[in-house]
Protein backbone atom coordinates (compact mmCIF):
# COMPACT_ATOMS: atom_id res chain seq x y z
CA UNK A 1 0.00 0.00 0.00
CA UNK A 2 1.22 3.49 -0.86
CA UNK A 3 1.96 5.53 2.24
CA UNK A 4 0.32 8.94 2.61
CA UNK A 5 3.85 10.30 3.05
CA UNK A 6 4.48 9.60 -0.63
CA UNK A 7 1.62 11.87 -1.70
CA UNK A 8 3.32 14.95 -0.24
CA UNK A 9 5.29 17.03 -2.76
CA UNK A 10 9.00 16.23 -2.87
CA UNK A 11 9.92 19.75 -1.75
CA UNK A 12 7.89 19.27 1.44
CA UNK A 13 9.39 15.85 2.16
CA UNK A 14 12.88 17.32 1.77
CA UNK A 15 12.40 20.10 4.35
CA UNK A 16 14.63 19.91 7.42
CA UNK A 17 12.47 21.29 10.27
CA UNK A 18 13.62 24.47 12.00
CA UNK A 19 15.47 23.74 15.23
CA UNK A 20 14.70 26.38 17.90
CA UNK A 21 16.79 27.02 20.98
CA UNK A 22 16.51 24.24 23.56
CA UNK A 23 13.82 25.03 26.18
CA UNK A 24 14.80 25.14 29.85
CA UNK A 25 12.27 22.43 30.72
CA UNK A 26 13.71 20.08 28.09
CA UNK A 27 17.25 20.46 29.39
CA UNK A 28 16.03 19.95 32.95
CA UNK A 29 14.49 16.62 31.92
CA UNK A 30 17.54 15.51 29.95
CA UNK A 31 20.18 16.42 32.53
CA UNK A 32 18.21 15.94 35.74
CA UNK A 33 18.71 19.60 36.62
CA UNK A 34 16.34 21.91 38.45
CA UNK A 35 14.88 24.49 36.03
CA UNK A 36 15.82 27.29 38.42
CA UNK A 37 19.55 26.66 38.04
CA UNK A 38 19.48 26.71 34.23
CA UNK A 39 20.17 29.88 32.25
CA UNK A 40 19.00 30.15 28.67
CA UNK A 41 21.03 32.40 26.39
CA UNK A 42 20.02 30.72 23.15
CA UNK A 43 17.01 32.43 21.58
CA UNK A 44 17.72 36.17 21.68
CA UNK A 45 14.93 36.80 24.16
CA UNK A 46 14.64 39.92 26.33
CA UNK A 47 16.25 39.20 29.72
CA UNK A 48 14.10 41.91 31.31
CA UNK A 49 10.99 39.93 30.42
CA UNK A 50 7.91 41.90 29.42
CA UNK A 51 6.78 45.48 29.99
CA UNK A 52 4.60 45.72 33.13
CA UNK A 53 2.12 47.71 31.03
CA UNK A 54 1.95 44.91 28.48
CA UNK A 55 1.47 42.36 31.26
CA UNK A 56 -1.44 44.36 32.67
CA UNK A 57 -2.97 44.58 29.19
CA UNK A 58 -2.76 40.80 28.87
CA UNK A 59 -4.62 40.35 32.14
CA UNK A 60 -7.38 42.69 30.99
CA UNK A 61 -7.66 40.92 27.62
CA UNK A 62 -8.31 37.59 29.33
CA UNK A 63 -11.70 38.89 30.46
CA UNK A 64 -12.93 38.57 26.87
CA UNK A 65 -11.01 35.45 25.89
CA UNK A 66 -14.13 33.52 24.80
CA UNK A 67 -14.52 35.93 21.87
CA UNK A 68 -12.63 35.67 18.61
CA UNK A 69 -9.91 38.30 18.19
CA UNK A 70 -10.24 41.24 15.83
CA UNK A 71 -9.21 39.68 12.53
CA UNK A 72 -7.99 43.03 11.23
CA UNK A 73 -6.12 44.01 14.42
CA UNK A 74 -7.76 47.45 14.40
CA UNK A 75 -6.37 48.80 17.69
CA UNK A 76 -2.90 47.41 16.99
CA UNK A 77 -3.00 48.74 13.44
CA UNK A 78 -3.93 52.19 14.73
CA UNK A 79 -1.11 52.07 17.29
CA UNK A 80 1.53 51.09 14.72
CA UNK A 81 0.31 53.79 12.33
CA UNK A 82 0.57 56.47 15.00
CA UNK A 83 3.96 55.33 16.30
CA UNK A 84 5.65 54.97 12.92
CA UNK A 85 3.62 57.47 10.85
CA UNK A 86 2.21 54.85 8.49
CA UNK A 87 -1.08 54.28 6.69
CA UNK A 88 -3.43 51.40 7.62
CA UNK A 89 -3.30 49.83 4.16
CA UNK A 90 0.49 49.46 4.39
CA UNK A 91 0.33 46.89 7.20
CA UNK A 92 0.18 43.12 7.52
CA UNK A 93 0.09 41.51 10.97
CA UNK A 94 1.46 38.09 11.73
CA UNK A 95 1.91 35.40 14.34
CA UNK A 96 5.46 36.62 14.88
CA UNK A 97 7.61 38.00 12.08
CA UNK A 98 8.18 34.41 10.90
CA UNK A 99 4.54 34.54 9.82
CA UNK A 100 5.26 37.68 7.79
CA UNK A 101 8.13 35.91 6.05
CA UNK A 102 5.90 32.94 5.27
CA UNK A 103 3.08 35.16 3.99
CA UNK A 104 5.53 36.89 1.66
CA UNK A 105 6.69 33.52 0.37
CA UNK A 106 3.14 32.24 -0.13
CA UNK A 107 2.14 35.37 -2.00
CA UNK A 108 5.21 35.79 -4.20
CA UNK A 109 7.09 32.49 -4.52
CA UNK A 110 6.05 29.58 -6.74
CA UNK A 111 7.86 26.67 -8.40
CA UNK A 112 10.15 28.19 -11.02
CA UNK A 113 10.89 31.34 -9.02
CA UNK A 114 13.94 31.99 -6.83
CA UNK A 115 14.70 33.49 -3.44
CA UNK A 116 18.14 35.00 -2.96
CA UNK A 117 19.60 35.39 0.53
CA UNK A 118 23.02 35.55 2.20
CA UNK A 119 25.11 32.53 3.15
CA UNK A 120 24.69 32.96 6.91
CA UNK A 121 21.11 34.22 6.74
CA UNK A 122 18.25 33.35 9.08
CA UNK A 123 17.22 29.73 8.42
CA UNK A 124 13.55 30.58 7.92
CA UNK A 125 14.24 32.26 4.55
CA UNK A 126 15.34 28.95 3.05
CA UNK A 127 12.59 27.06 4.85
CA UNK A 128 9.67 29.17 3.57
CA UNK A 129 11.21 29.18 0.10
CA UNK A 130 11.45 25.41 -0.02
CA UNK A 131 7.88 25.05 1.25
CA UNK A 132 6.57 26.88 -1.83
CA UNK A 133 8.57 24.78 -4.27
CA UNK A 134 10.73 27.75 -5.27
CA UNK A 135 14.52 27.54 -5.47
CA UNK A 136 16.75 29.03 -2.79
CA UNK A 137 20.02 30.70 -3.79
CA UNK A 138 22.53 31.28 -1.01
CA UNK A 139 25.03 34.00 -1.92
CA UNK A 140 28.48 33.63 -0.30
CA UNK A 141 28.95 36.04 2.58
CA UNK A 142 31.44 38.86 2.83
CA UNK A 143 32.94 39.12 6.32
CA UNK A 144 29.98 37.11 7.66
CA UNK A 145 27.53 39.66 6.23
CA UNK A 146 25.72 40.43 2.99
CA UNK A 147 27.73 40.79 -0.21
CA UNK A 148 25.36 43.23 -1.88
CA UNK A 149 27.24 43.28 -5.19
CA UNK A 150 27.07 39.49 -5.42
CA UNK A 151 23.38 39.55 -4.51
CA UNK A 152 22.71 42.07 -7.27
CA UNK A 153 24.57 39.85 -9.72
CA UNK A 154 22.36 36.90 -8.71
CA UNK A 155 19.11 38.68 -9.63
CA UNK A 156 17.09 37.37 -12.57
CA UNK A 157 13.52 37.95 -13.69
CA UNK A 158 12.52 35.14 -11.29
CA UNK A 159 14.13 36.62 -8.16
CA UNK A 160 12.81 37.69 -4.78
CA UNK A 161 15.28 38.90 -2.12
CA UNK A 162 15.62 38.39 1.65
CA UNK A 163 17.93 40.67 3.64
CA UNK A 164 18.30 40.80 7.43
CA UNK A 165 19.63 43.98 9.01
CA UNK A 166 21.11 43.33 11.53
CA UNK A 167 21.73 39.78 10.37
CA UNK A 168 21.07 36.75 12.54
CA UNK A 169 23.14 34.79 13.61
CA UNK A 170 26.19 36.86 12.70
CA UNK A 171 25.00 40.27 13.96
CA UNK A 172 26.47 42.14 10.99
CA UNK A 173 24.95 45.42 9.83
CA UNK A 174 24.57 47.12 6.47
CA UNK A 175 24.97 50.89 6.56
CA UNK A 176 22.01 53.05 5.64
CA UNK A 177 23.73 54.47 2.51
CA UNK A 178 24.82 51.01 1.32
CA UNK A 179 21.36 49.54 1.80
CA UNK A 180 19.59 52.43 0.11
CA UNK A 181 22.00 52.37 -2.83
CA UNK A 182 21.39 48.64 -3.18
CA UNK A 183 17.61 49.11 -3.27
CA UNK A 184 17.98 51.75 -5.96
CA UNK A 185 19.80 49.22 -8.14
CA UNK A 186 17.32 46.38 -7.65
CA UNK A 187 14.76 46.11 -10.50
CA UNK A 188 11.34 47.29 -9.37
CA UNK A 189 9.68 43.96 -10.20
CA UNK A 190 11.87 42.21 -7.59
CA UNK A 191 10.35 41.98 -4.11
CA UNK A 192 12.87 42.87 -1.38
CA UNK A 193 12.06 41.56 2.11
CA UNK A 194 14.02 43.56 4.70
CA UNK A 195 13.98 41.76 8.04
CA UNK A 196 14.56 44.29 10.85
CA UNK A 197 13.86 42.04 13.84
CA UNK A 198 16.69 43.62 15.84
CA UNK A 199 16.21 47.26 14.86
CA UNK A 200 15.41 48.35 18.43
CA UNK A 201 18.91 47.34 19.50
CA UNK A 202 20.54 49.81 17.10
CA UNK A 203 21.78 53.24 18.12
CA UNK A 204 19.69 55.99 16.51
CA UNK A 205 22.43 56.94 14.04
CA UNK A 206 22.66 53.34 12.78
CA UNK A 207 18.98 52.76 12.05
CA UNK A 208 18.02 52.50 8.38
CA UNK A 209 14.72 54.39 8.83
CA UNK A 210 13.53 52.26 5.94
CA UNK A 211 9.86 53.07 6.54
CA UNK A 212 10.57 56.45 4.92
CA UNK A 213 11.76 54.70 1.75
CA UNK A 214 8.44 53.05 0.96
CA UNK A 215 7.18 55.96 -1.12
CA UNK A 216 10.14 55.45 -3.44
CA UNK A 217 10.45 51.65 -3.36
CA UNK A 218 7.05 50.00 -3.74
CA UNK A 219 8.79 46.61 -4.01
CA UNK A 220 10.08 46.84 -0.42
CA UNK A 221 8.59 44.83 2.46
CA UNK A 222 9.93 45.57 5.96
CA UNK A 223 9.42 42.93 8.62
CA UNK A 224 9.37 43.78 12.35
CA UNK A 225 8.79 41.72 15.48
CA UNK A 226 7.75 42.28 19.08
CA UNK A 227 9.59 39.15 20.22
CA UNK A 228 12.94 40.80 20.91
CA UNK A 229 13.22 44.23 22.57
CA UNK A 230 9.48 44.32 23.32
CA UNK A 231 9.65 41.00 25.18
CA UNK A 232 6.60 39.29 23.65
CA UNK A 233 8.31 36.18 22.23
CA UNK A 234 5.78 33.83 23.80
CA UNK A 235 2.80 35.68 22.34
CA UNK A 236 4.03 35.77 18.72
CA UNK A 237 3.37 39.20 17.24
CA UNK A 238 5.01 40.68 14.15
CA UNK A 239 4.09 43.02 11.35
CA UNK A 240 5.08 43.84 7.80
CA UNK A 241 5.15 47.32 6.30
CA UNK A 242 4.99 47.66 2.54
CA UNK A 243 3.11 49.22 -0.35
CA UNK A 244 -0.70 48.85 -0.30
CA UNK A 245 -0.66 46.48 -3.27
CA UNK A 246 1.82 44.10 -1.68
CA UNK A 247 0.02 44.27 1.67
CA UNK A 248 -3.28 43.45 -0.01
CA UNK A 249 -1.88 40.29 -1.61
CA UNK A 250 -0.30 39.13 1.63
CA UNK A 251 -3.51 39.73 3.55
CA UNK A 252 -5.37 37.55 1.04
CA UNK A 253 -3.32 34.51 2.09
CA UNK A 254 -3.24 35.42 5.79
CA UNK A 255 -5.35 33.39 8.20
CA UNK A 256 -8.18 35.59 9.57
CA UNK A 257 -7.34 35.22 13.28
CA UNK A 258 -3.58 34.76 13.11
CA UNK A 259 -2.85 37.22 15.96
CA UNK A 260 -4.75 36.35 19.12
CA UNK A 261 -6.55 38.92 21.26
CA UNK A 262 -4.14 38.72 24.20
CA UNK A 263 -1.20 39.26 21.85
CA UNK A 264 -2.89 42.25 20.21
CA UNK A 265 -3.61 43.91 23.55
CA UNK A 266 -0.10 43.29 24.85
CA UNK A 267 1.45 44.56 21.62
CA UNK A 268 -0.38 47.89 21.85
CA UNK A 269 0.78 48.40 25.44
CA UNK A 270 4.34 47.32 24.62
CA UNK A 271 4.60 49.68 21.66
CA UNK A 272 3.47 52.54 23.87
CA UNK A 273 6.01 51.78 26.62
CA UNK A 274 9.08 53.58 25.31
CA UNK A 275 10.74 53.54 28.73
CA UNK A 276 10.83 49.72 28.79
CA UNK A 277 12.42 49.58 25.33
CA UNK A 278 15.01 52.17 26.40
CA UNK A 279 15.87 50.05 29.44
CA UNK A 280 16.16 46.98 27.22
CA UNK A 281 18.50 48.82 24.87
CA UNK A 282 20.70 50.07 27.73
CA UNK A 283 20.91 46.60 29.30
CA UNK A 284 21.85 45.13 25.94
CA UNK A 285 24.63 47.66 25.40
CA UNK A 286 26.12 46.92 28.82
CA UNK A 287 25.71 43.17 28.37
CA UNK A 288 27.34 43.24 24.94
CA UNK A 289 30.39 44.96 26.42
CA UNK A 290 30.49 42.48 29.30
CA UNK A 291 30.34 39.45 27.01
CA UNK A 292 32.73 40.66 24.31
CA UNK A 293 35.32 41.75 26.87
CA UNK A 294 34.94 38.39 28.60
CA UNK A 295 35.34 36.44 25.37
CA UNK A 296 38.43 38.47 24.48
CA UNK A 297 39.88 37.79 27.94
CA UNK A 298 39.44 34.07 27.24
CA UNK A 299 41.30 34.45 23.96
CA UNK A 300 38.22 33.81 21.82
CA UNK A 301 37.45 35.81 18.70
CA UNK A 302 33.91 36.95 17.96
CA UNK A 303 31.94 38.65 15.21
CA UNK A 304 31.12 42.28 16.15
CA UNK A 305 27.36 42.28 16.61
CA UNK A 306 24.60 44.88 16.35
CA UNK A 307 21.90 42.58 17.74
CA UNK A 308 21.22 41.21 21.21
CA UNK A 309 23.60 38.28 20.71
CA UNK A 310 27.17 37.57 19.70
CA UNK A 311 28.66 34.64 17.78
CA UNK A 312 32.12 33.54 18.86
CA UNK A 313 34.70 31.14 17.48
CA UNK A 314 35.73 28.16 19.57
CA UNK A 315 37.44 24.93 18.57
CA UNK A 316 35.22 21.85 18.76
CA UNK A 317 32.15 24.04 19.16
CA UNK A 318 29.72 21.10 19.25
CA UNK A 319 31.58 19.56 22.19
CA UNK A 320 31.73 22.90 24.03
CA UNK A 321 27.98 23.29 23.48
CA UNK A 322 27.31 19.91 25.09
CA UNK A 323 29.59 20.73 28.01
CA UNK A 324 27.71 23.99 28.57
CA UNK A 325 24.42 22.09 28.58
CA UNK A 326 25.70 19.66 31.21
CA UNK A 327 26.45 22.67 33.40
CA UNK A 328 23.03 24.21 32.89
CA UNK A 329 23.90 26.88 30.32
CA UNK A 330 22.01 26.93 27.01
CA UNK A 331 23.53 28.74 24.03
CA UNK A 332 22.95 28.20 20.33
CA UNK A 333 25.04 26.03 17.99
CA UNK A 334 25.18 27.55 14.50
CA UNK A 335 26.72 24.75 12.46
CA UNK A 336 23.52 24.68 10.38
CA UNK A 337 24.39 28.24 9.30
CA UNK A 338 27.67 27.08 7.77
CA UNK A 339 29.50 28.17 10.93
CA UNK A 340 30.60 24.85 12.48
CA UNK A 341 33.26 26.37 14.74
CA UNK A 342 30.99 29.05 16.23
CA UNK A 343 28.43 29.31 19.00
CA UNK A 344 25.92 32.13 19.46
CA UNK A 345 25.17 33.50 22.91
CA UNK A 346 22.31 35.89 23.66
CA UNK A 347 22.80 38.89 25.92
CA UNK A 348 21.35 38.14 29.34
CA UNK A 349 21.23 39.81 32.71
CA UNK A 350 24.61 40.73 34.21
CA UNK A 351 24.63 37.67 36.47
CA UNK A 352 23.66 35.36 33.58
CA UNK A 353 26.44 36.72 31.37
CA UNK A 354 28.93 36.28 34.22
CA UNK A 355 27.78 32.70 34.80
CA UNK A 356 28.16 31.86 31.11
CA UNK A 357 31.69 33.28 31.00
CA UNK A 358 32.65 31.47 34.21
CA UNK A 359 31.38 28.11 32.96
CA UNK A 360 32.94 28.61 29.53
CA UNK A 361 36.30 29.38 31.17
CA UNK A 362 36.05 26.19 33.23
CA UNK A 363 35.37 24.14 30.09
CA UNK A 364 38.28 25.69 28.20
CA UNK A 365 40.67 25.05 31.10
CA UNK A 366 39.82 21.34 31.11
CA UNK A 367 40.90 21.12 27.47
CA UNK A 368 44.36 22.64 27.90
From Swiss-Prot:
GO annotation, biological process: L-histidine biosynthetic process
InterPro entries named in the record: Aminotrans_II_pyridoxalP_BS, Aminotransferase_I/II_large, HisP_aminotrans, HistidinolP_aminotransfase, PyrdxlP-dep_Trfase, PyrdxlP-dep_Trfase_major, PyrdxlP-dep_Trfase_small
Keywords: Amino-acid biosynthesis, Aminotransferase, Histidine biosynthesis, Pyridoxal phosphate, Transferase
Pathway as given in its UniProt record: Amino-acid biosynthesis; L-histidine biosynthesis; L-histidine from 5-phospho-alpha-D-ribose 1-diphosphate: step 7/9
Keyword Amino-acid biosynthesis belongs to the record: yes
PROSITE patterns: AA_TRANSFER_CLASS_2
Signal peptide region: none
Catalytic activity: L-histidinol phosphate + 2-oxoglutarate = 3-(imidazol-4-yl)-2-oxopropyl phosphate + L-glutamate
Molecular function terms, GO-annotated: histidinol-phosphate transaminase activity; pyridoxal phosphate binding
Pfam family, one: Aminotran_1_2
EC nos: 2.6.1.9
Residues bearing the modification N6-(pyridoxal phosphate)lysine: 228
Keyword Transferase: yes
Cofactor(s), names only, from the UniProt record: pyridoxal 5'-phosphate
Membership in a protein family: Belongs to the class-II pyridoxal-phosphate-dependent aminotransferase family. Histidinol-phosphate aminotransferase subfamily.
Subunit structure: Homodimer.
Name of this protein: Histidinol-phosphate aminotransferase
Gene source species: Methylobacillus flagellatus
Amino acid sequence: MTRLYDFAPSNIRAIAPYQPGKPITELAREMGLKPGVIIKLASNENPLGVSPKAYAAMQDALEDIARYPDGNSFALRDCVCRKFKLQPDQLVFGNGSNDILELAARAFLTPGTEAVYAQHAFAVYALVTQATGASGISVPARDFGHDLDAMLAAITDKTRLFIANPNNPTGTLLSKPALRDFLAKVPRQVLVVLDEAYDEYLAAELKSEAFSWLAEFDNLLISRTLSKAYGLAGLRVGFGVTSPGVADLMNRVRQPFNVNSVAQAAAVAALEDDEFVERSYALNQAGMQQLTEGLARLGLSYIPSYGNFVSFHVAQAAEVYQQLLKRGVIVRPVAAYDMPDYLRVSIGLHAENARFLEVLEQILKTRT
